[in-house]
Curated annotation (Swiss-Prot):
Membrane topology: Multi-pass membrane protein
Span of the signal peptide: 1-22
GO cellular component, one term: pore complex
Assembly and binders: Part of a disulfide cross-linked outer membrane complex (COMC) composed of the major outer membrane porin (MOMP), the small cysteine-rich protein (OmcA) and the large cysteine-rich periplasmic protein (OmcB).
Protein name as it appears in the record: Major outer membrane porin, serovar H
One Pfam family here: Chlam_OMP
Biological processes annotated in GO: monoatomic ion transport; regulation of cell shape
């Protein structure tokens, strides 16, 4: 049985090193691996000893914490219906019979959409308070940065197409978008911002060199969106440090997307994650491989902020946006005609929808190398609900 357990854990550890896949599971035996300190010797006494004191029971560890999520499995968390203008019909020809001015409930193209890519990289300081070489209470303080990419439907990219309203009357018409642009890509990069986490880990059961342990962790961060890219043939644009409207319904203010816009706020993403895990390790001299399972929930909430396409406050050369003509036929209609804006996408906007975990369960495999019972380095890989790698280097005082 011992040989089988050794084989399984060693294989798992070696596999993790060869396939790097935002919270780590960690080694379940970590509270009891470093039993000596660089400044004070370990006590290693009995908690039931009446002569033992809290000074004997408590020790500190500090170190580096690096967590690198290459692909978190996420999906949107939105309602089934979305409020916007009515879709054009076959009765509409060169332009709309009736320009949309009121919102109607339409199927939400963002409902249940999967994100194509979600990355997060964290570098932090690690601090752990150890009790009786069995329990750890720890925290991390550092910085994180992220990247998100998905189909434009996930971000409710919408615009107005086919309007017959004259350009001279457009600013006062209070029209709403009627087209969902679902065949495009939206990506965003966040800035590097403060991140923190807290957690606890316990070695629940020990038998010889084997240890079964459990942990619970919570992490939080709120990065701002540094750059937003919309890759769409009908309306392609990039915004650095985007701002938008929170809680605003269509129509947005006609100044949205211009330098004169008011009532906007910076686009930021509130990241929360909590995780519970159970893991098994087996010590082989200085190596302690382990394998674990975890259950976690993560959310990325940007308050459903609506961000408008950049445009000019006043037309220059009869142009306010750089959106191309779409029909690809006919002649350019003179400015002032009824449908001079019908062939370009107008009042384009998107919103940053709330996202959550698409899969809650995952596995982690890793190994810890301990030197002189004072220093340790842990390398870990996580799979299924995310592809991630974790590195932790620490020492005991």
């Amino acid at each position: 049985m011992k040989k089988l357990l050794k084989s399984v854990l060693v294989f798992a550890a070696l596999s993790s090193a060869s396939s790097l896949q935002a919270l780590p599971v960690g080694n379940p035996a970590e509270p009891s691996l470093m039993i000596d300190g660089i400044l004070w010797e370990g006590f290693g006494g009995d908690p039931c000893d009446p002569c033992a004191t809290w000074c004997d029971a408590i020790s500190m560890r500090v170190g580096y914490y690096g967590d690198f999520v290459f692909d978190r499995v996420l999906k949107t968390d939105v309602n089934k219906e979305f409020q916007m203008g009515a879709a054009p019909t076959t009765n509409d020809a060169a332009d709309l019979q009736n320009d949309p001015k009121t919102n109607v409930a339409r199927p939400n193209p963002a409902y249940g959409k999967h994100m194509q890519d979600a990355e997060m990289f964290t570098n932090a300081a690690y601090m752990a308070l150890n009790i009786w070489d069995r329990f750890d209470v720890f925290c991390t303080l550092g910085a994180t940065t992220g990247y998100l990419k998905g189909n434009s439907a996930s971000f409710n990219l919408v615009g107005l197409f086919g309007t017959k309203t004259k350009s001279s009357d457009f600013n006062t018409a209070k029209l709403v978008p009627n087209i969902a642009l679902n065949r495009a890509v939206v990506e965003l990069y966040t800035d590097t911002t403060f991140a923190w986490s807290v957690g606890a880990r316990a070695a629940l059961w020990e038998c010889g060199c084997a240890t079964l342990g459990a942990s619970f962790q919570y992490a939080q961060s709120k990065p701002k969106v540094e750059e937003l890219n919309v890759l769409c043939n009908a309306s392609e644009f990039t915004i650095n440090k985007p701002k938008g409207y929170v809680g605003a319904e269509f129509p947005l203010d006609i100044t949205a997307g211009t330098e004169a816009a008011t009532g906007t706020k910076d686009a930021s993403i509130d990241y929360h994650e909590w995780q519970a895990s159970l893991a098994l390790s087996y010590r082989l001299n200085m190596f302690t491989p382990y394998i674990g399972v975890k259950w976690s929930r993560v959310s990325f909430d940007a308050d459903t902020i609506r961000i408008a396409q950049p445009k000019l406050a006043e037309a220059i050369l009869d142009v306010t946006t750089l959106n191309p003509t779409i029909a690809g036929k006919g002649t350019v209609v003179a400015s002032g005609s009824d449908n001079d804006l019908a062939d370009t996408m107008q009042i384009v906007s998107l919103q940053l929808n709330k996202m959550k975990s698409r899969k809650s369960c995952g596995i982690a495999v890793g190994t810890t190398i301990v030197d002189a019972d004072k220093y340790a380095v842990t390398v870990e890989t996580r799979l299924i609900d995310e592809r991630a790698a974790h590195v932790n280097a620490q020492f005991r005082f």
